[in-house]
């Protein structure tokens, strides 16, 4: 099984191959840009590029070694999973009756003297409306 240095070397080789292919792609695009490209020629060039990249990736021996290394990982996780947080504050509904709020017609208060809308001024208050 390869160690990390060997894998790093192979990955850097693939990276350099990809960079050289990038310059080749630029050259091809410049060549195609100088001509009047057709859709078929562009598709053929794109298919060739995809095939070349796929072949490079599939032929790389580091892929097999990486998969083997991943398969040989220990079953126990080396990283501790975060513990579940407690429930924290329980912010439920009010536990006391909120008399004096709500609308009796809507059933939101058990207080028969709850304020209603439109507001009806109590006797003795000036009439604002």
UniProtKB/Swiss-Prot annotation:
Gene Ontology cellular-component terms listed: host cell plasmodesma; virion component
Keyword Disulfide bond: yes
Recorded coiled-coil stretches: 1-31, 38-59
Subcellular location: Virion; Host cell junction, Host plasmodesma
One Pfam entry name: Cauli_DNA-bind
Sorted UniProt keywords: Coiled coil, Disulfide bond, Host cell junction, Virion
GO molecular function annotations of the record: DNA binding
Positions of the UniProt region annotated as Capsid binding: 122-129
Quaternary structure note: Homotetramer, through coiled-coil domain. Homotrimer when interacts with icosehadral capsid. Interacts with capsid protein, and with Movement protein.
Protein function: Plays a role in virus cell-to-cell and plant-to-plant transmission. Interacts with virion icosahedral capsid and movement protein, thereby facilitating virion cell-to-cell transmission through plasmodesmata opened by viral movement protein. Also interacts with aphid transmission factor, attaching the virion to aphid stylet when the animal feeds on an virus infected plant. Aphid saliva may later detach the virion, inducing release of infectious particles when the animal feeds on a new plant.
Family from the record: Belongs to the caulimovirus ORF III family.
Identification of the protein by name: Virion-associated protein
Gene source species: Cauliflower mosaic virus (strain BBC) (CaMV)
Classification lineage: Viruses, Riboviria, Pararnavirae, Artverviricota, Revtraviricetes
């Amino acid at each position: 099984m390869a160690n990390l240095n060997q894998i790093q070397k192979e990955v850097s080789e693939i990276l350099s191959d990809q960079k050289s292919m990038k310059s080749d792609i630029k050259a091809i695009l410049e060549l195609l840009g100088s001509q009047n490209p057709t859709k078929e020629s562009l598709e053929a060039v794109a298919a060739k590029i995809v095939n070349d990249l796929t072949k490079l990736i599939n032929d790389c021996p580091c892929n097999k070694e990486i998969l083997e290394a991943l398969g040989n990982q220990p079953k126990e996780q080396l990283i501790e999973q975060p513990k579940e947080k407690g429930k924290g504050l329980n912010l439920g509904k009010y536990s006391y009756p909120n008399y004096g709020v709500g609308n009796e017609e809507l059933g939101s208060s058990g207080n028969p003297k709850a304020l209603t809308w439109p507001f009806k001024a109590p006797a003795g208050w000036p009439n604002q409306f």
